[in-house]
Amino acid sequence: MHYFNRAKKAKNNEFYTLFEDIAAEVACYPNAFKGKVVLCNCNDGYQSNFWQFFQSQFHALGLKKLVAIAFNPLGNSYQLNFDGKEIKELPLAGNGSFDSAEAIVLLKQSDIVVTNPPFSLFQDFVCLLAEHGKQFLVLGHNGAVGYNQIFKLFKEEQLWYGHTVNSSMLFQVQSNFKLYDPKSVNFVKKDGQLFQKVPGISWFTNLKKNQQPAWLKTKSRYQGNEHKYPKFDWYDAIFVSKVKEIPLDWFGYMGVPLTFLNCFNPKQFELIDCLANPYATLDTLKTNAYVRSHHGDVRNVKGKRRYVRVVIKQRQNVI
């Protein structure tokens, strides 16, 4: 999260996804792309690995059409179209931003969006896709779950994690990347190119997975172990340190790690809220006004601020 926050403040915060990482995730949805129009609307022209991957795998995936938009912050840009035989480059009147009028026209004509949007615009990007009812497979940071609209989509079962979750991934960055630190182990130089290792990266999607997460089973119990599950100072829920420590005999509210969302089964649990900031993301329990007036922090447990927690509640009669 540290590097993510710093990158949000940098002007050149683009992270370019590696070919092999795209291939590994797309392979988990073998039938999702057949006969579909794929749009890569946060693209970097011909050199983008999203463009190169889908062009090279066009026939293997059974695509109908591939469209990519090249973003040019300094002036007019272009779009790329590929029908399996010929590449056509067409000029755009604007800079190719994903939220421009031209890009939205192309979005409406597409079936699936696959790309790596700027981290700082992740919520705006995903909300735009959801607004237009599009299927998507996009990269983002785990911390994005704490954004109001992103968590709301999780809660409404319109968004979930892909197959690669909470991973430390290498991204190619610009050679003049302002946050580059040659002494840091998080930067790698290879064949004249610069890469940064970014922790906590996940794929986010609304594509159907082959299997729904299995029923969560743990050996942990609340009764007799109350000391292991202290309550949050400013929120009426117990604190759970690890997913494997979720007590299955507890039916009240509990704050669990973000990684729980990777095994979330809506038939077993209900998503209530997210404690990502001093205040609850959705304010489901209407606590924020009180917490704000007393300068509290809903993440605190015994005065110590904890990392992001998802508030869940177990459904009755599920043990």
Curated annotation (Swiss-Prot):
GO terms for biological process: methylation. It catalyses: a 2'-deoxyadenosine in DNA + S-adenosyl-L-methionine = an N(6)-methyl-2'-deoxyadenosine in DNA + S-adenosyl-L-homocysteine + H(+). Its EC number is 2.1.1.72. Disruption phenotype: Essential it cannot be disrupted. One of its GO terms (molecular function) is site-specific DNA-methyltransferase (adenine-specific) activity. InterPro entries: DNA_methylase_N6_adenine_CS (IPR002052), EcoRI-like_methylase (IPR025247). PROSITE patterns: N6_MTASE. Keywords: DNA-binding, Methyltransferase, S-adenosyl-L-methionine, Transferase. It comes from the Bacteria. It is an enzyme of class 2 (transferase). Induction: Detected after 6 and 96 hours growth, there are fewer copies at 96 hours (at protein level). Belongs to the N(4)/N(6)-methyltransferase family. This is Type II methyltransferase M.MpnI. The lineage of its organism: Bacteria, Bacillati, Mycoplasmatota, Mycoplasmoidales, Mycoplasmoidaceae.
